[in-house]
């Protein structure tokens, strides 16, 4: 048996379905800036860089629907559809760009 690595996750064989049965939405996002913008998997999408243009009201309380620890990079002039998933748990958001700093609901 190989040595254990602290924090390592060993999933059961088969396919993992992330965020199953969670509310999602798809938004068209455009980078109007002159620099690339990278958004991480657990960043409150509503509070991303203002050079990203999309329906911010719809994005409130959502994050990217991508695996934890990954990110999406938007190059200048880039426009694409992204899938967002609703935040779960207590649905309180603190930090990021300080636009919420409290409960979402």
Swiss-Prot record:
EC numbers listed for it are 3.5.1.5
> Pfam families attached here?
Urease_beta
Q: Which UniProt keywords apply?
A: Cytoplasm, Hydrolase
UniProt main location, coarse:
cytoplasm
- Report the GO terms under cellular component: urease complex
Q: What is the reaction catalyzed?
A: urea + 2 H2O + H(+) = hydrogencarbonate + 2 NH4(+)
Protein's cellular compartments: Cytoplasm
| Listed PANTHER family | UREASE
Instruction: Spell out the subunit comment.
Output: Heterotrimer of UreA (gamma), UreB (beta) and UreC (alpha) subunits. Three heterotrimers associate to form the active enzyme.
What is this protein called in UniProt?
Urease subunit beta
Q: Which species is listed as the source?
A: Prochlorococcus marinus (strain MIT 9313)
């Amino acid at each position: 048996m190989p040595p254990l690595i602290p924090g390592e996750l060993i999933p059961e064989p088969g396919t993992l379905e992330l965020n199953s049965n969670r509310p999602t939405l798809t938004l068209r996002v455009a980078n109007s800036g002159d620099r690339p913008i990278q958004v991480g998997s657990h960043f409150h999408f509503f509070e991303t860089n203002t050079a990203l243009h999309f329906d911010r009201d719809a994005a409130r309380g959502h994050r990217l629907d991508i695996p934890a620890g990954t990110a999406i990079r938007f190059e200048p002039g880039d426009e694409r559809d992204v899938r967002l998933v609703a935040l779960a748990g207590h649905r309180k958001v603190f930090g990021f760009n300080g636009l919420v700093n409290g409960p979402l609901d």
